[in-house]
Amino acid sequence: MKKKIIIANWKLNGNIQLLQTLLKPLVNFYIRHKNKSSIKLVIMPPYVYLYPMKSIISHSSILLGSQNVDINLIGAFTGEVSINMLKDVGVSYVLVGHSERRQYHRENDVIIAKKFKIVKDSHLIPVLCIGETEHEYLSCKTEKICKFQIDAIFDLLGPSGFNNSVIAYEPKWAIGTNTIPSINFIQKILMFIQNYIFNKQNSTIKLFSLQYGGSVNEHNIIELYDVKNIDGFLVGSASLSLDFFKKLLNNC
């Protein structure tokens, strides 16, 4: 059975104390839990906690992820972090294209595609966030928006662009609102994404994983867990709670 990938995006949250009160108990709970074989956990803390987190999770199969990366490898780029630095501290997954990066940091599809490429070139796994605004959702433009965001990767990397990658469908209007699309709608969009990539790569071999993100919590993740085509979840604020992980592991 293919493992579901649960990615915990801590965003601008956390402190040293949280590593002790959340992460250490989570590691112990995960190690001894019977369902750990069906779930792959990836935690993405703020940059400053990557290295201390590495030592805490080192004796478990929990993986380290980064919320961002710069497109440059070295040089006079104050405040940035390169892919080689992330590799150096043990990062396996890198998030690119999150709607908050698109909105607040003016990242466009060209920049996002470059970040995606540099992650792949370094043999790490990129996690591409795609999704529509509420206006686009109400205007029935979800598929069109997802297509544009996917095409930016194919334009730069070609037909094999999404091999060994994760695509997280995360509608912007669902983030932090406690509102999610209907299960039927999520299934429809994930099927569209899958078939669109199959068509572009001229193959129906699924070498990528599809996730849902946006207001995922300890209640709705159980309902969504077995939805067709969902290979995992991108989780925000709920992943700051040990109870979320306990419920997930106890029920999935």
Swiss-Prot record:
PANTHER family: TRIOSEPHOSPHATE ISOMERASE
Signal sequence bounds: none
Active-site positions on this chain: H98 (electrophile), E170 (proton acceptor)
Class of this enzyme: isomerase
Protein name: Triosephosphate isomerase
PROSITE patterns (alphabetical): TIM_1 (PS00171), TIM_2 (PS51440)
Subunit structure: Homodimer.
One GO term (biological process): gluconeogenesis
Provenance organism: Buchnera aphidicola subsp. Baizongia pistaciae (strain Bp)
Gene Ontology MF, one: triose-phosphate isomerase activity
EC number: 5.3.1.1
Chief place where the protein resides: cytoplasm
Subcellular localization, as worded in the UniProt entry: Cytoplasm
Keywords: Cytoplasm, Gluconeogenesis, Glycolysis, Isomerase
Lineage: Bacteria, Pseudomonadati, Pseudomonadota, Gammaproteobacteria, Enterobacterales
Top-rank lineage group of the source organism: Bacteria
SUPFAM superfamilies reported in the protein's UniProt record: Triosephosphate isomerase (TIM)
Record's keyword annotation contains Metal-binding: no
Chain sites annotated for binding substrate: N9, W10, K11, G176, S215
Family under the similarity heading: Belongs to the triosephosphate isomerase family.
Catalytic activity of the protein: D-glyceraldehyde 3-phosphate = dihydroxyacetone phosphate
Pathways involved: Carbohydrate biosynthesis; gluconeogenesis; Carbohydrate degradation; glycolysis; D-glyceraldehyde 3-phosphate from glycerone phosphate: step 1/1
GO-annotated cellular components: cytosol
Functional summary from the UniProt entry: Involved in the gluconeogenesis. Catalyzes stereospecifically the conversion of dihydroxyacetone phosphate (DHAP) to D-glyceraldehyde-3-phosphate (G3P).
